[in-house]
């Protein structure tokens, strides 16, 4: 195995190890998010993007080269030509075909796992953010529920107070009705008393008029009696 393919194979093994490490169930996404949030990653972010694209290009080139080698050594004409020249050429061609196929698988899976690794890191980051947002939303929901319960309790208190106010209002209305009825009764009684007083005043005036008439009649009769008495006395004196 040449140095370049040994490096690609080592890169493939490292990718497999990282993918298995990311898939461990006892390491939560929040822990990976903290690791990804180190300041060193921010400093090499621009370099990392360039390196990512460079590695993809190199792996694509190696993959295409491996495809070319596989097609080259898989050709029937090449195998027959080598077999006709040297008897051991067939085994040599098959060995090169095996190496080409191995290199094809190494470069292909390295390219595939490299893309999977990038996507896996993105998904872990998004999952950690979603979990954090879920925690924040859970806290907000709990606070909202507490506030809603508090508002409901205050609403019940207000309803109870309103009911008490309504009861007091009904009592006040009943008392007001009673007072109005008492007022009407007092007005009726006052009117009756006023009518009775007016009638009594009229009776007094009538009696006063009658008394004056009787007094005048009495004075007239008394005057006539005096005159008659004087006449009688005068007649008695004349008869003597």
Curated annotation (Swiss-Prot):
Keywords: Apoptosis, Coiled coil, Endoplasmic reticulum, ER-Golgi transport, Membrane, Protein transport, Transmembrane, Transmembrane helix, Transport
Keyword match Coiled coil: yes
Chain ranges on the Cytoplasmic side, renumbered to this chain: 28-43, 125-240
Residue ranges the record marks as coiled coil: 166-232
Quaternary structure (record): Homodimer and heterodimer with BCAP31. Binds CASP8 as a complex containing BCAP31, BCAP29, BCL2 and/or BCL2L1. Interacts with VAMP3, VAMP1 and membrane IgD immunoglobulins. May interact with ACTG1 and non-muscle myosin II.
Known function: May play a role in anterograde transport of membrane proteins from the endoplasmic reticulum to the Golgi. May be involved in CASP8-mediated apoptosis.
Protein name according to UniProt: B-cell receptor-associated protein 29
Protein species of origin: Mus musculus (Mouse)
């Amino acid at each position: 195995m040449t140095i370049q393919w040994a490096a690609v194979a080592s890169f493939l093994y490292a990718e497999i190890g990282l993918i298995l490490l990311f898939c461990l169930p006892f390491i939560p996404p929040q822990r990976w998010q903290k690791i990804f949030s180190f300041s060193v990653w921010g400093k090499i972010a621009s370099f990392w993007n360039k390196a990512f694209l460079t590695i993809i290009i190199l792996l694509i080139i190696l993959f295409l080269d491996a495809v070319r080698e596989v097609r080259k050594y898989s050709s029937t004409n090449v195998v027959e030509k080598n077999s006709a020249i040297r008897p051991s050429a067939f085994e040599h061609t098959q060995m090169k075909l095996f190496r080409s196929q191995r290199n094809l698988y190494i470069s292909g899976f390295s390219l595939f796992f490299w893309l999977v690794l990038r996507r896996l890191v993105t998904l872990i980051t998004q999952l950690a953010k979603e979990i954090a947002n879920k925690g924040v939303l859970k806290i907000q929901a709990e606070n909202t529920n507490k506030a809603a319960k508090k508002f409901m309790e205050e609403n019940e208190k207000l309803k109870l107070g309103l009911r008490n106010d309504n009861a007091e209002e009904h009592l006040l209305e009943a008392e007001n009705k009673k007072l109005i009825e008492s007022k009407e009764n007092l007005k009726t009684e006052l009117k009756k008393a006023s009518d009775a007083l007016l009638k009594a005043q009229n009776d007094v005036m009538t009696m006063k008029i009658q008394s004056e008439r009787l007094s005048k009649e009495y004075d007239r009769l008394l005057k006539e009696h005096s005159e008659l008495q004087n006449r009688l006395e005068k007649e008695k004196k004349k008869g003597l």
